[in-house]
Amino acid sequence: EFVRFAASDSQVGLEEVVVIAQSVGAVMVATWVHDYAPAIRGLVLVSPAFKVKLYVPLARPGLALWHRLRGLFFINSYVKGRYLTHDRQRVASFNNDPLITRAIAVNILLDLYKTSERIVSDAAAITLPTQLLISGDDYVVHRQPQIDFYQRLRSPLKELHLLPGFYHDTLGEEKRAQAFEKMQSFISRLYANKSQKFDYQHEDRTGPSADRWRLLSGGPVPLSPVDLAYRFMRKAMKLFGAHSAGLHLGMSTGFDSGSSLDYVYQNQPQGSNAFGRFIDKIYLNSVGWRGIRQRKTHLQMLIKQAVAHLHAKGLAVRVVDIAAGHGRYVLDALVNEPAVSDILLRDYSEVNVAQGQEMIAQRGMSGRARFEQGDAFNPAELSTLTPRPTLAIVSGLYELFPENEQVKNSLAGLAKAIEPGGILIYTGQPWHPQLELIAGVLTSHKDGKPWVMRVRSQAEMDSLVHDAGFDKCTQRIDEWGIFTVSMAVRRDN
């Protein structure tokens, strides 16, 4: 939002913005670009602090353990001004500045490590023009993660410069003119040409996420340690599934089914005995399901925001959710929204439709809400929805299907149904820490086959939405970087 404000205040489009960031700021910008896929012109990252040097052995696991036992505490930074720059004036300024604190909250440091590892490992999702400047004598951060990050970038325009003798404060070094010259040259190249748009047309066939999906679909090497571990987990789940309500439901309907999702939303451990409830609690507290519940919160926030926006513009608020599951999150978000005149929930599953109709009746919403069976990938069905929706919701659907052609068909149908000025709310899954585990252990709603997912980068998902005729205007993401919820406006073609 700050970059959007800065662009607006400068009276330029977002596509004219180049962001320059150093150290921890560079990590923040790399994370922002990865998670939100802003349509800026490019970025310059200077000595990104992807891995801070901790000179005490086992410092990081020790801090993590102590944080778990003790809670929040602060540690004093070892960094002195003389480790940052050769510029004596800046060293003195650093040492005497009362606004610079040596105390660092342990959760901030640990989160910096976790986020950096995620962004470096998945840097292939970043396709913007990028320049990376690395200080040659950096006593504060490690160099190898910076190089790994750069090598994984997929921008057709990227360049790396190593500055010999430079300390960590690259842009505050004594010979910083060298760094600024390289930045000026790179930025001039960006503005000398049209803003580059990465081509995502074949991402589902030739991109790195497609390669990973195919590898996961093939399964691990037979009788390898990983394969044996997954076999053990599957047997354990069958054993515990008799006692854990969540595991039993997942194995019966698919862990990606609407019924499983609704159970996760409720977040109430259930089982045939105390042991079963204990197992169920562990299951519900997995990072993926915590992310799902945060996604529900973000969905409801943006649904309410969209309703308020449409109402303020004097437009009728007619809602459709094309793959609603049981519809709990939509109905809970809209039950107290009098501006909404019509709610249509759809799903492919007869079970979900029946459960959803019960929820509508329980909430006393039968006068303006209905639930019907329908195909979310049939553009002919979607384009003829009546009445024409002004707010369409697609949650948790596209993430389950690796091919983009189905997604394009669905979005094309919605684009025909929604009039200009209408709103689309859609979800994404740009990254997941448990892809391998899920593919090896859990089953899907597709006839009990392994639940293998292809992650779509946020930039890829936004590209599909934009090509269909929508302009993204806002987004939310959970603290783990797994699930996104975005809002886009139907543009007038």
Where are these regions (language model features)?
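Conserved acidic catalytic loop of the alpha/beta-hydrolase fold
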Residues: 2-15
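Short beta-strand/loop motif that positions the catalytic acidic residue
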Residues: 126, 132-134
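Short alpha-helix in the alpha/beta-hydrolase fold that links the catalytic acid
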Residues: 128, 142-151
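Catalytic active-site module of serine/aspartate enzymes centered on a nucleophile-bearing elbow/loop
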Residues: 161-212
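Class I SAM-dependent methyltransferase Rossmann-like catalytic core
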Residues: 244-312
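Conserved SAM-binding loop of SAM-dependent methyltransferases across substrates and taxa
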Residues: 326-339
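A short glycine-rich, Lys/Arg-flanked "PGG" loop and its adjoining helix->strand segment in the class I
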Residues: 408-420
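Conserved beta-strand signature within the Rossmann-like core of class I S-adenosyl-L-methionine
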Residues: 421-428
